[in-house]
Amino acid sequence: MQPLFKRCGAEFFGTFWLVLGGCGSAVLAAGVPQVGIGYAGVALAFGLTVLTMAYAVGHISGGHFNPAVTVGLAASGRFGWRDVPPYIVAQVVGAIVAAATLASIAQGVAGFDLVASKFAANGYGDHSPGKYSMQAALICEIVLSAGFVFVILGATDKRAPAGFAPIPIGLALTLIHLISIPVTNTSVNPARSTGPALFVGGWALEQLWLFWLAPIAGALVGALAYRLVGTPSAQR
């Protein structure tokens, strides 16, 4: 196992890449006239960030890039609880630095208003892309976060085909975005939500609690579900 500072460094860079690539595609490329990538392009971008960084640094840190994933892996017994806080700090800092980088790029075009653009922040109610309620957002984020952690645990199981885990994980994140961008702008990742929210302020910070609570709760559900169905009977 790599030293903790190296693993946290890998988590920093992985989360930085996720937020810069995923949120960057939403802020810079989704609505470009005629050639904008739209929801499908943004969903694919998020999946690609995880797939590429999982191959790049997964062997160093495990490739979490997400506080909810870290908590879910710890709850499943795959990761030590004592390393959860430093991993989460590294992930959140990586997300904030990525959001700052993205803001500096986005503001390089005349007329860009960071707050008015919503800067890929997550929200519900009036701040949901489809105006979905808080209850709908809560259910969506819990269920999809549970599914994401379930896929991660299955794909990284020792009984699963070796070397392919980043592919189903990246595809799962793409699918999650295809489902939930209209609902919450898709979080399933508290660090990803925190970076943009700090720059938007106001409503984004007021609603940030949901995008910590729901993904972590969902991760715990996903971990429990995989323990129930994925653990060999002799080990229960």
Swiss-Prot record:
Q: Which CDD domains match?
A: MIP
**Family of the protein in this entry:** Belongs to the MIP/aquaporin (TC 1.A.8) family.
The site (Selectivity filter) lies at 46, 177, 186, 192
Q: Topology in the membrane? A: Multi-pass membrane protein
Provide the taxonomic classification.
Bacteria, Pseudomonadati, Pseudomonadota, Betaproteobacteria, Burkholderiales
> Per its UniProt record, what HAMAP family does this chain match?
Aquaporin_Z (MF_01146)
Keywords attached to this entry: Cell inner membrane, Cell membrane, Membrane, Repeat, Transmembrane, Transmembrane helix, Transport
Cellular location(s)? Cell inner membrane
Q: What is this protein called?
A: Aquaporin Z
Q: Which reaction equations make up its catalytic activity?
A: H2O(in) = H2O(out)
Task: Report the coiled-coil segments.
Answer: none
Quote the record's domain comment. Aquaporins contain two tandem repeats each containing three membrane-spanning domains and a pore-forming loop with the signature motif Asn-Pro-Ala (NPA).
Gene Ontology CC annotations of this record: plasma membrane
Where are the residues marked Involved in tetramerization or stability of the tetramer as a site? 23
InterPro entries from the entry? Answer: Aquaporin-like, Aquaporin_transptr, Aquaporin_Z, MIP, MIP_CS
**Oligomeric state and partners?**
Homotetramer.
The record's listing under Pfam families reads:
MIP
Q: What does this protein do?
A: Channel that permits osmotically driven movement of water in both directions. It is involved in the osmoregulation and in the maintenance of cell turgor during volume expansion in rapidly growing cells. It mediates rapid entry or exit of water in response to abrupt changes in osmolarity.
Q: What GO annotations for molecular function exist for this entry?
A: water channel activity
Transmembrane parts of this sequence: 12-32, 37-57, 92-112, 136-156, 163-183, 197-217
Concerning PANTHER family, the annotation shows: AQUAPORIN NIP1-1-RELATED (PTHR45724:SF13), AQUAPORIN NIP2-1 (PTHR45724)
Which intervals of this chain are the motif NPA 2?
189-191
Q: Where is this motif: NPA 1?
A: 66-68
